[in-house]
Amino acid sequence: MITSELPVLQDSTNETTAHSDAGSELEETEVKGKRKRGRPGRPPSTNKKPRKSPGEKSRIEAGIRGAGRGRANGHPQQNGEGEPVTLFEVVKLGKSAMQSVVDDWIESYKQDRDIALLDLINFFIQCSGCRGTVRIEMFRNMQNAEIIRKMTEEFDEDSGDYPLTMPGPQWKKFRSNFCEFIGVLIRQCQYSIIYDEYMMDTVISLLTGLSDSQVRAFRHTSTLAAMKLMTALVNVALNLSIHQDNTQRQYEAERNKMIGKRANERLELLLQKRKELQENQDEIENMMNSIFKGIFVHRYRDAIAEIRAICIEEIGVWMKMYSDAFLNDSYLKYVGWTLHDRQGEVRLKCLKALQSLYTNRELFPKLELFTNRFKDRIVSMTLDKEYDVAVEAIRLVTLILHGSEEALSNEDCENVYHLVYSAHRPVAVAAGEFLHKKLFSRHDPQAEEALAKRRGRNSPNGNLIRMLVLFFLESELHEHAAYLVDSLWESSQELLKDWECMTELLLEEPVQGEEAMSDRQESALIELMVCTIRQAAEAHPPVGRGTGKRVLTAKERKTQIDDRNKLTEHFIITLPMLLSKYSADAEKVANLLQIPQYFDLEIYSTGRMEKHLDALLKQIKFVVEKHVESDVLEACSKTYSILCSEEYTIQNRVDIARSQLIDEFVDRFNHSVEDLLQEGEEADDDDIYNVLSTLKRLTSFHNAHDLTKWDLFGNCYRLLKTGIEHGAMPEQIVVQALQCSHYSILWQLVKITDGSPSKEDLLVLRKTVKSFLAVCQQCLSNVNTPVKEQAFMLLCDLLMIFSHQLMTGGREGLQPLVFNPDTGLQSELLSFVMDHVFIDQDEENQSMEGDEEDEANKIEALHKRRNLLAAFSKLIIYDIVDMHAAADIFKHYMKYYNDYGDIIKETLSKTRQIDKIQCAKTLILSLQQLFNELVQEQGPNLDRTSAHVSGIKELARRFALTFGLDQIKTREAVATLHKDGIEFAFKYQNQKGQEYPPPNLAFLEVLSEFSSKLLRQDKKTVHSYLEKFLTEQMMERREDVWLPLISYRNSLVTGGEDDRMSVNSGSSSSKTSSVRNKKGRPPLHKKRVEDESLDNTWLNRTDTMIQTPGPLPAPQLTSTVLRENSRPMGDQIQEPESEHGSEPDFLHNPQMQISWLGQPKLEDLNRKDRTGMNYMKVRTGVRHAVRGLMEEDAEPIFEDVMMSSRSQLEDMNEEFEDTMVIDLPPSRNRRERAELRPDFFDSAAIIEDDSGFGMPMF
């Protein structure tokens, strides 16, 4: 009996009004007319159906025939009039109102309950996707288990889908209709039919049996039905409880009347009504008890995540709907345990269920023990690897904070605080909401009302802004102010837009008794203020958050315009004052100068505010003259560029001010250069500083402004030539002169490309570029590293800009400006990369120790080296530098993988797209270089087991993996690689005689790593080519020094069948792993092999480039555990060592000439192909027959297994290991709590009860 464990169902004092469908009271006629129940405490039978009388047989058979005419697996069958004939069809189509459908069924039940019940049984069977139909003989003579076993045999084994999992809007609608049908059915039957001890016993017994099936479709569908059935029963129980309370109050009121006014008949009637309600409630509790213990406690830990999620979602509904009965530790423990589920969707349902409870503050006392027990787990879930779960966990923690601030410790809050800096915006916004609730919510209404009358620094926002600044400084993430502002934007927008208060805090002196802001606090406030201005003006998240700019709605657009006007009108006046106050502080000025780019500059004219523009220009000029820091100068230059925009009327005024400023600096620069060059080595520090400071300012302005009319290139070139010839020029001057000259050349190129240049203009620019490239090349040998790095970067940039691509887009007239680097320059660039990028870690550490630089400087140095490598790699990718130069880069792939692995891999991928053959030659060349270096270090007698040899072999293995799975596509490239490798191995003869191995013979062991990428017929051809270099003596040798040759030969003559199958897999598409494939589609590899031209030679191949076709998307990884593919298995087999290459897949081109002759005849090839395919079809059929639809429910099943490399498998294992298990470990504080009350959350109790729990639930 439920009543023993849930006294609240008996003693409920809930005074909430009843639901509209139940009414305030039960009709007396319904109470009196209800038939007597035999054994109200008897749970429904789960084994045997009630027997039917012989007289009912014909009627039942007629009903079964009517109910069974529809097909189950989603294909409706209609009668002659086009109307659906089964409940399944009616619910699936959803054309009729659900209440009318249920009313029709109830009417049928009243006429003949067996026919109606059988229709309902077949409804659940068909909703599971089963083709079978329960017949009268089965219904009468077989137990539930036998019926379910019979229905299991009727499933369509070719498909793993069933209505609840089928895609498409129709089936999504079906799920909602299915749930609605169950709810309406119980609601309409709640006054009579559900108490007849027949309907509910039969339905619950069937659903209990189906939920214990090994067939996923049965288990999933019946669990959903049972949980929705339970939810409807909970609603009925709640209504009964309310009616009981009302009846009890009426009875007490009548009994308390004076004897003369008391109506005894009414007292008896109320007493009888109360008794009937209690009996009904006992009956409902028995039903809920059967569903909960028979279904929920087993299925909430089902192997299928969707089933577990259904259980948790519904128990949350029960606890919220009927909190007096269900919101206690006996039920909450299931949600708490499932917080550790390994699947994110289940954890998400747990959090959603808890959110609905914590939203109601009246329920907090009942949640106190649960909060104490699972608070740590909930807080830790804010760092969940699935962002959706993390967001909901943060929202739940916010609700807990809102209900009781004492529930969370300072440490718990700090764990959420730092998430405002998360790159994932929903997580950050949720954390911002938490931060707003904790720090910025005002809780004193009187103080708020008093402060609301004040404005500026004394307004309510004044203290909150100070608090925000302190939080920002304490977080020690000062480069992420934009992220902090974005996180708080939705919850604290009013505070963040109070720019008046911010500027008053910065400009006004503190009043007496008020603590002044420190320099750090002022800098932080300025940075935050600029970020709020950007957020308001642009109305989209900062870089790194979100996928890009979205289209604003009309309301958002209006808000953006209003905010932009508001900030413009305010800062047009206050910005000059802020610049004046903080003009000496470079960091503050650089931030303040970001503000004008967000102005609506039209307001200067429309608002008659030109005087404020003059004040701003005056302050900017003062800042330029005062500072030489690059950040400040670039900010000033950008501000001038924005104010000079041609679409605004203020452009002329700003252009005049800018020209005057540039004139002054150019005159000063020309005079200081003359003084410096005249004095030569005798120049003092003042002369050097004058040149350097002025040149820095001009370089910063030249970046954003066309200063070619001032001819800065001439003096810069003079400084560079003097530095090269005499070597006494300071490195900073050289660096700035190089950069300024570079900008000058680019602006000249812009003029030429935008206009109609004459031949003379082209020749002048060509001469300028040629002379500057020569200077940069000479600077590569400079003793100062910054000079060399700057020269290298500018060389790479200019070679890219003035390459053959300059003529694309109809600009053939610019051909005189194209520069192709000669061999000497290419060698110098490559040597620079080798010397400055691929440096040993020890050398780097020593240099860092000598300069006393910290970890941040190491990261900065690595960033510079990565830029150098990327600049040179672009020259290779765009065919400006010969591809063979990449060999020196590829050979460092393993050693410097952590630092440059992504750059090198991308370079390899792009070069392969340019020319597969040449790329393969480059790869083998890089391995040959490493081998030669090793021979020079250790001599010709290499130790094959040494780490150096193993490293080369590992690098070769990695290179082999990059060729991908499609061996036909890479066939000629791999063949060429083997050809070059063999020639290298036998290039030199041993000076001691032919009986000794060639010096490079050990290289064959490295080459054998690529043998798995050869086709079967190509292995024979390569073997034949190898034998041309072998003598009879070599073939007979078995000494250790000849083992590389033996190993390589073995790799070419073994594995034929495996390679044959790998060809098939390489030609298959990504659709081979799908659940269902189109019938009759021929295997792709057969078609390709038949179309292949196999009569071309490879031995005499020339090195002509073969352009590859365009890329196609790489095949997707799909699940193959539970749902086998109906296509031949030959299309799915892949080599164990293969992985998806970095190169995208290409369409096979039958016209491409494939070399390597000596292949088997085409007829023999096709015959073996057909034999292999027939065998695979047999294997596939056997797998389908054995597989069936059975599943074990002991452990969750992971389906994603098509991983193609060891690293991917390791990543998958790590992902599974760090997910959460369902069961909690024993609590550390269980002993203390056990003295006070039982610990309902102890997951160790799971093993103590056959139902899964150590304590009786009911």
From Swiss-Prot:
Signal peptide: none annotated. Residues 1-84, 1055-1096, 1129-1148 are annotated as: Disordered. One of its GO terms (biological process) is sister chromatid cohesion. Pfam families: HEAT_SCC3-SA, SCD, STAG. Belongs to the SCC3 family. The gene is STAG1. Residues 1076-1087 have a biased composition (Basic residues). The keyword Ubl conjugation applies. Phosphorylated by PLK1. The large dissociation of cohesin from chromosome arms during prophase is partly due to its phosphorylation. Residues 10-19 have a biased composition (Polar residues). Cohesin complexes are composed of a heterodimer between a SMC1 protein (SMC1A or SMC1B) and SMC3, which are attached via their hinge domain, and RAD21 which link them at their heads, and one STAG protein (STAG1, STAG2 or STAG3). In cohesin complexes, STAG1 is mutually exclusive with STAG2 and STAG3. Interacts directly with RAD21 in cohesin complex. The cohesin complex interacts with the cohesin loading complex subunits NIPBL/Scc2 (via HEAT repeats) and MAU2/Scc4. NIPBL directly contacts all members of the complex, RAD21, SMC1A/B, SMC3 and STAG1. Residues 1062-1074 have a biased composition (Low complexity). There is a cross-link at K1161 (Glycyl lysine isopeptide (Lys-Gly) (interchain with G-Cter in SUMO2)). This is Cohesin subunit SA-1. Keywords: Cell cycle, Cell division, Centromere, Chromosome, Chromosome partition, Disease variant, Intellectual disability, Isopeptide bond, Mitosis, Nucleus, Phosphoprotein, Ubl conjugation. Residues 53-62, 1137-1146 have a biased composition (Basic and acidic residues). Residues 296-381 form the SCD domain. The modification Phosphoserine is found at S24, S756, S1062, S1065, S1093.
